[in-house]
């Protein structure tokens, strides 16, 4: 929930004109096994929702999945079709010790700062705080856009980084709503009753940001990477039908990938469902 995919996409936009990029991911909850390189016939279930999202958005990069990252990197470097790769971006490998990266980037959620957290099971940390010393770059994500200079200084001191480590701050920018099934854009949702539909790790930020932008908002949340079953689709249909007119559903790009493959959504739901891209 720290914003790995938007930051990987930012790096893709930053680098793709200069170098040939491959994204290598674990491919969480995919149905395939081993190493898979995405092509024009690849489906979401082959590589997972987030890799598939990037595969759809960026046609000039390679997207591959492999739980064994070293094997995945070796395949990218040795296979004829991908041997022109200059940079491999791994979206969740800070603790994958078999990989020795050229640059380590650590993302820290502004709302869940690791300096105030504890190790599992008391907190959410998977390793001691001292592990942050492996990072070349630390990014505090999901910051308020009006972060004051004093808070920059306080956070910089609290993070207690080494001189060689760079610290950056990022915030979320929302793009124009786009129809999940129709492709139509919706510039302003302020007059709509909204069902916010999410299956992500940390939906509260999105709820907080969207609430002032719409007439009224109800939320329907599922677990991260949730695969929508028939009973879930029924809940979505019923929750949408219960909203007053005019009404729409807003969901994330990642959820839209899975919802497009779901069966049983009412046509009225499909026509009124929008994804909210973030950068």
PLM regions: where:
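Short, flexible loop segments at boundaries between secondary-structure elements
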Residues: 223-227, 268-279
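Short, aromatic/basic amphipathic alpha-helical patches
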Residues: 78, 151-160, 210-211, 259-270
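Acidic beta-strand-to-loop metal/phosphate-binding motif
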Residues: 247-254
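Conserved beta-strand elements of the Class I
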Residues: 20-24, 106, 193-197
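Walker A (P-loop) phosphate-binding motif
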Residues: 1-40, 145
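C-terminal accessory "lid"/substrate-recognition subdomains
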Residues: 113-246
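Hydrophobic residues at beta-strand termini and immediately following loops
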Residues: 64, 108, 170, 220, ...
């Amino acid at each position: 929930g720290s914003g790995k995919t938007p930051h990987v996409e930012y790096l893709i936009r930053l680098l793709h004109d200069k170098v040939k990029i491959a994204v290598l991911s674990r491919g969480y909850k995919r149905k395939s096994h081993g190493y898979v390189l995405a092509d024009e016939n690849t489906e979401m279930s082959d590589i997972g929702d987030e890799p598939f999202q990037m595969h759809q958005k960026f046609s000039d990069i390679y997207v591959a999945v492999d739980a064994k990252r070293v094997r995945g990197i070796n395949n990218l470097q040795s296979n004829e079709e991908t041997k022109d790769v200059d940079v491999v971006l791994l979206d969740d490998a800070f603790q994958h010790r078999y990989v020795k990266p050229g640059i380590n980037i650590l993302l820290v959620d502004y709302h869940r700062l690791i300096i105030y957290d504890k190790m599992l099971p008391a907190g959410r940390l998977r390793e001691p705080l001292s592990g942050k010393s492996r990072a070349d770059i630390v990014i505090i994500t999901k910051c308020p856009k009006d972060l004051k200079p004093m808070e920059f200084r306080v956070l910089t001191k609290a993070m207690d980084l080494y001189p060689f480590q760079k610290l950056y701050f990022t915030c979320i920018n929302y793009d124009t709503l786009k129809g999940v099934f129709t492709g139509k854009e919706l510039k302003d949702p302020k007059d709509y009753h909204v069902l916010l539909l999410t299956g992500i790790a940390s939906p509260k930020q999105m709820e907080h940001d969207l609430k002032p932008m719409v007439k009224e908002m109800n939320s329907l949340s599922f677990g991260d990477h949730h695969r929508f079953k028939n009973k879930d689709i029924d809940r979505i249909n019923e929750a949408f039908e219960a909203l007053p007119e005019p009404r729409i559903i807003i969901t994330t790009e990642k959820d839209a990938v899975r919802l497009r493959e779901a069966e049983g959504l009412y046509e009225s739901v499909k026509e009124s469902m929008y994804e909210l891209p973030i950068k």
